């Protein structure tokens, strides 16, 4: 039996639309991510467990884990009879890389079960392909950090899909999921087809400056450059209370905040534990919409997807 855990991730990070993402893990030791188990069997089967299992498609072939198994078998050119179990701990349409968690855990578990026939680059390419079936287009800003860990910059040149960018140990990521769903496809459809020249220049300056600040170890500069002129101005209308929440967390002391992925999760970066706790408390009382919502104080998950049992 192989059991693989794949962590949540926060894509875009305001400054890097479709090209930046960070894997995150709660500081209290909770597992914020999906788990997939693969066991040898006579025929294929898929079982769904976990807090959000009831949100998965009722038709098994529509389940992305089934599609991962099917695509992996196609890649190897043979049928692989296994019993798969998806522990769905991540809310769907949350902006925390929920589909990426399932895809990464499923493909990595299959690869481990079969003795690692695929290298990491090929595996990551498959992960992007499968996640793209849900989000509507191939982009790696969730699957890459989820699989590889840390903060990842998408390269997609010279056979390099992504490379790690150094993060800041003092940064605490407060993630508030309000309990409502925003589909990635819907959030992409709301974006304009063309952008003004000054917005393109600002976006390039912010992203280049942020990467420079990460490598030159300037956390204050990096945080100040986490501005979004590409998606947030259009997507914030999908998120009730988002603008007020951003203003509130800034007043409490967050050094940066924005939409995690395509939302509705809000992320707030803090450089002090007491500030992070006060931000988390405020968001828990004011940003959550229902009982399914949650707030976690996280750090970068530098390990990425990992085998829990083998």
UniProtKB/Swiss-Prot annotation:
> Can you tell me which family this protein belongs to?
Belongs to the GHMP kinase family. Homoserine kinase subfamily.
Q: Any idea which UniProt keywords this protein has?
A: Amino-acid biosynthesis, ATP-binding, Cytoplasm, Kinase, Nucleotide-binding, Threonine biosynthesis, Transferase
Q: Which GO terms describe its cellular component?
A: cytoplasm
**Binding, ATP:** 91-101
Q: Name one GO biological process term.
A: threonine biosynthetic process
What the entry lists under PROSITE patterns is as follows: GHMP_KINASES_ATP
Pathway participation: Amino-acid biosynthesis; L-threonine biosynthesis; L-threonine from L-aspartate: step 4/5
Query: Where located?
Result: Cytoplasm
Role: Catalyzes the ATP-dependent phosphorylation of L-homoserine to L-homoserine phosphate.
State the name under which the record lists this protein.
Homoserine kinase
Q: List the InterPro entries hit by this protein, alphabetically.
A: GHMP_kinase_C_dom, GHMP_kinase_C_sf, GHMP_kinase_N_dom, GHMP_knse_ATP-bd_CS, Homoserine_kinase, Ribosomal_Su5_D2-typ_SF, Ribsml_uS5_D2-typ_fold_subgr
PANTHER family, alphabetically? Answer: HOMOSERINE KINASE (PTHR20861:SF1), HOMOSERINE/4-DIPHOSPHOCYTIDYL-2-C-METHYL-D-ERYTHRITOL KINASE (PTHR20861)
Against SUPFAM superfamilies, the record matches this protein to:
GHMP Kinase, C-terminal domain, Ribosomal protein S5 domain 2-like
- GO MF annotation, one: homoserine kinase activity
EC? 2.7.1.39
Q: Does this entry carry the keyword Kinase?
A: yes
What main location does UniProt list?
A: cytoplasm
Catalytic activity, per the record?
L-homoserine + ATP = O-phospho-L-homoserine + ADP + H(+)
**Key word Iron-sulfur present in the record?**
no
